Amino acid sequence: MPPILQRLQQSTKMMSHRKILLLVLGCSTVSLLIHQGSQLSWYPKLFPLSCPPLRESPPRAKHMAVAFLKTHKTAGTTVQNILFRFAERHNLTVALPHPSCEHQFCYPRNFSAHFVHPATRPPHMLASHLRFDRAELERLMPPDTIYVTILREPAAMFESLFSYYNQYCPAFRRVPNASLETFLRAPEAYYRPGEHFAMFAHNTLAYDLGGDNERSPRDDAAYLAGLIRQVEEVFSLVMIAEYFDESLVLLRRLLAWDLDDVLYAKLNARAASSRLATIPEALARAARTWNALDAGLYDHFNATFWRRVARAGRACVEREARELREARQRLLRRCFGDEPVLRPAAQIRTKQLQPWQPSRKVDIMGYDLPSGGAGPTTEACLKLAMPEVQYSNYLLRKQKRRGGVRSRPESVLDNPPPRPIRALPRIPQGT
């Protein structure tokens, strides 16, 4: 072979080796960057798993003015407890009901600022049951208040309502053998619009949100669209009970709170023996048909919820939700032992943690503190699991004392047992 051809062949081989080497180095570099992508946030557009830190730098000030519309049978008691504990840690005033309203703001009447106990005004937060009235809430709350609520899938919610209020709602009491299936087979045979506690038997979500629960989207689609528009105008976040931890991640980010601020113990949960393990498909369809207004609300806000998660970065939200669950389990173990379990009220020794029982047919579960505990940690754990009525009573006494109404210090352990529901509350006179 001529010398010139030999030199050309050697040059070609060297170039091929360089290309191969560069290709290997390039692949290795890209592989390393992808591997580090979930930990490095230097180029978020290329690596979507790069998530914002839990604590912003510089940190935003935590938002203190929050109004939570506590809807019925939607995990609202757990959210309320989160807000109550945050308010206590930051010495905030929580709006609480006038004594004649008991522990709700004279529900099911439309909310009025007159229903708020004078010792708890002006408030930073509000989280007790009420029927939404925008004008009255804006009259009461600070101008920078962030409004939040929570919805639950209507079939599951209705099963819970039917079980929980079976002894109080006449429409449910009329049903033979307290059968949900019998009621949903012919709901008009048992339901009477406008009677005592009727709102628990038909479109309860719509009623809580201030809507007309007797309207049907099948007959008036414009009404549902208008109600959705009203909710969107007011509420910065509509949480979804089925995705509770993801909802708390969005809430934490909205309010610029820390992860520790949204840790929780599950409250007001029924025992397995008091609920259907699964709702048959036909029964779920019947429940959604009967509660069509609620179904329309839920379907819309469930869709907007996931669009919001997508904007925040679904992988990032899921990662933070996992971190929340892990931190929550550590907290529960520290407070309630290595294997914290929900217990029937009869097995809870600490009276302040015994949840109210709506009837003999329904067991509401709770936690108990290990014996021998004392000190700040015990008090924090007590509040973590404290039922709504006891916590509301405690906060009212504490805020009265802060306002000079009472001078004797109140103990967190000094809580009377909750009273049963008897009748509609009276309207308080004056302010």
Curated annotation (Swiss-Prot):
GO terms under biological process: glycolipid biosynthetic process
Alphabetical UniProt keywords: Glycoprotein, Golgi apparatus, Magnesium, Membrane, Signal-anchor, Transferase, Transmembrane, Transmembrane helix
Domain of life the protein comes from: Eukaryota
Family matches, as InterPro entries: Gal-3-0_sulfotransfrase, P-loop_NTPase
Lumenal side: 41-431
A Pfam family hit: Gal-3-0_sulfotr
Disordered as annotated region, ranges: 400-431
SUPFAM superfamilies per record: P-loop containing nucleoside triphosphate hydrolases
Example of a GO MF term: galactosylceramide sulfotransferase activity
EC number: 2.8.2.-
Cytoplasmic compartment segments: 1-19
Location(s) in or outside the cell: Golgi apparatus, Golgi stack membrane
Residue ranges, compositional bias (Low complexity): 421-431
Task performed by this protein: Transfers a sulfate to position 3 of non-reducing beta-galactosyl residues in N-glycans and core2-branched O-glycans. Has high activity towards Gal-beta-1,4-GlcNAc, Gal-beta-1,4(Fuc-alpha-1,3)GlcNAc and lower activity towards Gal-beta-1,3(Fuc-alpha-1,4)GlcNAc.
Descriptive protein name: Galactose-3-O-sulfotransferase 3
Organism: Mus musculus
Lineage summary: Eukaryota, Metazoa, Chordata, Craniata, Vertebrata
Gene that encodes it: Gal3st3
